[in-house]
UniProtKB/Swiss-Prot annotation:
Any one annotated GO CC term: membrane
Broad class of the protein's primary localization: membrane
Membrane topology listed for this record: Single-pass membrane protein
Keyword Transmembrane helix: yes
Coiled-coil region: none
Cofactors required: heme
Record-given protein name: Cytochrome P450 76C1
E.C. designation(s): 1.14.-.-
Entry's localization field: Membrane
Binding site residues for heme: C450
A GO molecular-function annotation: heme binding
Family: Belongs to the cytochrome P450 family.
SUPFAM superfamilies linked to this entry: Cytochrome P450
Species assigned in the record: Arabidopsis thaliana (Mouse-ear cress)
Amino acid sequence: MDIISGQALLLLFCFILSCFLIFTTTRSGRISRGATALPPGPPRLPIIGNIHLVGKHPHRSFAELSKTYGPVMSLKLGSLNTVVIASPEAAREVLRTHDQILSARSPTNAVRSINHQDASLVWLPSSSARWRLLRRLSVTQLLSPQRIEATKALRMNKVKELVSFISESSDREESVDISRVAFITTLNIISNILFSVDLGSYNAKASINGVQDTVISVMDAAGTPDAANYFPFLRFLDLQGNVKTFKVCTERLVRVFRGFIDAKIAEKSSQNNPKDVSKNDFVDNLLDYKGDESELSISDIEHLLLDMFTAGTDTSSSTLEWAMTELLKNPKTMAKAQAEIDCVIGQNGIVEESDISKLPYLQAVVKETFRLHTPVPLLIPRKAESDAEILGFMVLKDTQVLVNVWAIGRDPSVWDNPSQFEPERFLGKDMDVRGRDYELTPFGAGRRICPGMPLAMKTVSLMLASLLYSFDWKLPKGVLSEDLDMDETFGLTLHKTNPLHAVPVKKRANIN
């Protein structure tokens, strides 16, 4: 929702509050002392600053403004000083050169409503011992190369189930909701790694849609522009309902987590012999954790699971949906990807994770999807812990820093034909998404790079390759590829507004 529309009267009332006028006068005095060194930006209105320029799609609004004011742009969003980064060079300064100074987070009002910033791997300051502990546990117990390799068979089985369900839909000549089936597959991969159970079922549409809608609502509420983020004294009002949505949806997820945690605790207490630790899942390892730091509380575990669950399911399923959307919109590109897969796998095989490295064009399709449809368009908001200089401009302490990776991915000075889906641009180039190339950083970079990146890349690539190998795809009757809906909804993540429906056609008889 637009942060101005629907609440204009209340914001106008706020304009005349004398206490706020005094506050803004004090703030403006601080800024003026270093004004010549600050990044350029658009003119500001009294009190609200540049909020009227944000709109429903901040990543697009900021990209347009950056064309005028440059790759390091200053905005005043209510009482919040903000700098928007929109070039690879500036992104390198933020994510690498000044990584330590700019690695703090700027939690949104929704996140603060459940004190998630005090226990979350995403929102805790990277300088804290708690963050280092959670990061270490996440990597060693879940996301290390060894752990990811150990769950390879699990991913293969879940993708086989996906292919089997789509095969049944093909037999019935039914279209498939790509968003839904991708989410279920990703959900079951994540839930098995975390809890050793399937949480989703392809044949339980109503129940699983509830989980998917809950996760998307959490991400939207956490990332949607909110008046309370810019006017802290408005927090108690929850003008746009983001706090209510965030609380209701996270509580719903936490109840699910707590059920599994309680069951595991009861199982451990009833066992006479210790369980084989090689069969432990992530929650088992967290419950068993003993370290130099204080032990993890159940609340700590719930907050960590909330991070893993929401980030791990929404981003991967959304990326697969965007990839399939672009391929259906560009049938020659889809045919080229399918021909490569058929050549490598053969006519009666099955796609294995080890095959992905032999599929450079498929890898290019995934990279091109991340370029055009980056899952987190502004990355997670950062906060300057001290003054920092970015490309000759001063970023003051406590300034919010947004890296507009969506804008960088569509910058004509960086990419030829930036609005076109052309995987060929990556062929023969040593460019990846691992945080080394600042033209393409969908997972961030530096100490704050998403630890789930390797798992996400394997999951998305395996699902996409399997769908393209097993089926030809066409749009529902009456829908033309050139008219395919590309509308998007902004939140902490960027997902397709209207789910993609496509009709699968079996490419070979032995699919089941």
